[in-house]
A protein has these predicted regions:
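Tubulin/FtsZ superfamily GTPase core signature
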Residues: 1-129
Length: 129
């Protein structure tokens, strides 16, 4: 197997081959990282996605930021989420895309900059639609 670094792992968990970086951490090394605090977003898009936001809020899911995105202002008003975004308001006038995926896409593209700002810095984003 040419090109594959050869070596052995010592009692401390580190490899003995020069130039290799250990990929596993022991318990004491893990403790130095502290408690992780990831920024997790759950984005519900459209009517179905917004219904999911309501359910997540109702059952009390914690540790995630909930974001509702919709073209229908009335549905968005009745959605429970930490952040709400009405997209395509100049296209649909807040009346919704009527289940038309092409219209929904146009509205999402119109809100691309705002959506990008919302998800920037997130460690993990779940999208439900």
């Amino acid at each position: 197997m040419s090109g594959v670094p050869q070596g052995s792992v010592g009692m401390d968990g580190r490899t003995t081959t020069s130039g290799r970086i250990p990929t596993a951490l022991r318990d004491r090394e893990l403790e130095s990282f502290g408690t992780p605090d990831p920024r997790i977003l759950v984005c519900g898009c459209g009517g179905s996605g917004n219904n999911t936001m309501n359910r997540i809020t109702h059952i009390g899911v914690e540790g995630a930021i909930t974001v509702a995105i919709n073209t229908d202002k009335q549905h968005l008003d009745h959605t429970r989420a930490m952040q709400k975004l009405l997209v395509g308001r100049h296209i649909t006038r807040g009346l919704g895309a009527g289940g038309d995926p092409i219209m929904g896409r146009r509205c999402a593209e119109a809100g691309r900059d705002v959506i990008s700002k919302i998800v920037t810095g997130a460690d993990l984003v779940f999208v439900t639609a």
